[in-house]
Amino acid sequence: MSRSLIAPIALACTLSFAAQARADTVSFARFANGSQSVDIALGSPNVPKNLSTQAGGFTTSLNGGPSFVSYCIDLYEYLLFGTPFTDYTLVPAASHAFTNAAAAADIGKLYAENNPVNSSVAQAAFQIAIWEITYETSGAYNLGTGTAMFSGGTAGTSGALTLASSWLGALATTTNNAYAVWALDSIGNPGHQDQVFATPVPEPSTYALMAAGLLCMGVFGRRRAARQD
């Protein structure tokens, strides 16, 4: 089995078990590829807010499983690197309470564009695009107008804002059959930043391997329980 296949299967198994749990432990190690600063203005129907923050993806771990990159979908909460949080629950992104009803589907399309996201500029652009999709309700994605606006900071001078705009513009001609989109919802009060990420939809052969792995884990679990009895 190739290493490139092991990681998606391991993450899929982690997601399978997490989806059955009431609460999950989530850790954020760092920005995955650095970040860029940006100024944000949110307007009604969002709770109005103006802030300056860093945009980028997070190196994330769910219940001690393999790391992956997640993105913030909650500009009203905060998080800390290196601190495990136990107030999260994993849900399909379609179940998350987005302000924008089309957000879950459009975030899936953003992933399906398969743009390279391997630098601080690209990851900042991806995060800004996700924020725009999350909070924009005017009917058109435009970083400079509407209910979610983004400007300035190093995102403006580095080209991250321009890149985000181009990716948002491509959504209208993009379809998504390749990615399942998930949300990590913080259930605390106060909570922490809700997150979103995507996993590739497995090929049928990968499903078979996952099923075999889960079956083996179940058999070993039953044998261990029998020995303890």
Identify the meaning behind each predicted range.
Residues 218-229:
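C-terminal membrane-anchoring or membrane-association module
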Residues 24-199:
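Short, surface-exposed polybasic-aromatic patches that bind anionic ligands, especially phosphate groups
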Residues 2-9, 13-15, 19-25, 193-220:
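Short, threonine-centered small-residue motifs that mark membrane-proximal processing/anchoring sites
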Residues 10, 134, 228-229:
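Enrichment for repetitive, rod-forming helical segments
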Residues 4, 128, 223-225:
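Hydrophobic alpha-helical segments, especially transmembrane helices
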